């Protein structure tokens, strides 16, 4: 005999199902469930008097020797990923996602994809949202607190460069030379996050860059503050092609070594990741945004200019002066800073993101951006664009799935593809490391509930440890057991070049973390950017007005006075 529940009651018990939508935070974005792997009436729910008990939803006989038995089940999760928005149980074993579907006891339940046994832990995610851990490709390694601040907004992987608050690191995302690369690899070995380091891409000989890749750098960064010259770019790209590592560039704002067209020529059709492609963070003034229309260029943004608000322009000038070691008493330094801040290109940047012409969102952490705001700014921008541009094609009332999948890809799968780590992380897919972020829908985009690294709870909202329950105040994000001891080494990854990996860099310098090589970075095009592969035929920036035109049509938007996911979430 069946038991009937109305839709609202079912959602309260088991989470949304097909036909339901979930509002994301206080935005006007709604995620509609596209598929539900649940068998109604046989949901795997944990708790007193519930299903996941011995001999019911939990197998009474299967041991962990059975590879179908998982270490952790995340039950009833609403998964938001570039691959889709679905409702499913997630099975984790040995730190990786081994199944997405339906978990339980095959002796008592139908259509079970993986087994819950005596060795299985349960995380109840009914009514909660699960995303892949965020990846920030543009981090200045200035403060050792960056990983924790990133985790506070769901960032689990950091790529960038630096050695601490040295002036070179304050300005550029480069870790220069074997000594610094070695020491920084050792420094982050006990930090609960994934890391990759970018070499300094300068010089008229390839050897000066090659030695850094051999030392363990996972990519190369050419930056104007060290000189973004034709020779430096060309030689860095030669090394990137030889060793299969990513190449990123912060181009020449002053146009001293050449103009945008000269830099484009230096690329020679090779794959390039352009940082802050709008230009306020740096790059050819005023027309770096032209790069967003090139097939061989993978363009990213930094979060200080996203979304475009009434206060955005005001803070940018001071940021540039401090970040790039400029002197307000020198008129030329002030002119340099002013040349980079253009409200017209900032306005166009929002729209290009919404079109899918800008593929990646990053922070530029501590050097004009905030590592703890990558995810939040991404969803604020999506919300602003829905309000100003309306639904994307294929979206409808209470269904913004196309826009949601486009924006989640900007800080998960696309940065993973760009830096050659998509085989390991970047999406909620079977076979990848279980770097997962669990959100309450009301807090989505602002404050995670739990963060898993390599299948282990590492950060999360936790109450007073001296209380009788985990819920009493103050409930704040705190480190959990995965952030301590040898667990850090077993659940986090250091990414290096294939050369360094093959030549035993882990043993050579005494690393304890998982060490993995980056790969498949050199034959990428804009078409490889998931749901963000639009390459306009022509992008033109008027040199006098700085207005942006795509195929001769003006591209702009208005600044907003208030954003979603802002003050009501951060009272202090």
From Swiss-Prot:
The keyword Chloroplast does not apply. Ni(2+) 1 binds at residues 138, 140, 221, 364. Ni(2+) 2 binds at residues 221, 250, 276. InterPro entries: Amidohydro-rel, Metal-dep_hydrolase_composite, Metal_Hydrolase, Urease_alpha_N_dom, Urease_alpha_subunit, Urease_AS, Urease_asu, Urease_asu_c. SUPFAM superfamilies: Composite domain of metallo-dependent hydrolases, Metallo-dependent hydrolases. Substrate binds at residue 223. It catalyses: urea + 2 H2O + H(+) = hydrogencarbonate + 2 NH4(+). Pathway: Nitrogen metabolism; urea degradation; CO(2) and NH(3) from urea (urease route): step 1/1. The modification N6-carboxylysine is found at residue 221. GO terms for cellular component: cytoplasm. Its cofactor is Ni cation. GO terms for molecular function: nickel cation binding; urease activity. Keywords: Cytoplasm, Hydrolase, Metal-binding, Nickel. Residues 133-572 form the Urease domain. Its EC number is 3.5.1.5. GO terms for biological process: urea catabolic process. Its main location: cytoplasm. It holds the Pfam family Amidohydro_1. Binds 2 nickel ions per subunit. It is found in: Cytoplasm. The active site is at 324 (proton donor). HAMAP family: Urease_alpha. Belongs to the metallo-dependent hydrolases superfamily. Urease alpha subunit family. Heterotrimer of UreA (gamma), UreB (beta) and UreC (alpha) subunits. Three heterotrimers associate to form the active enzyme. This is Urease subunit alpha. It comes from Streptococcus thermophilus (strain ATCC BAA-250 / LMG 18311).
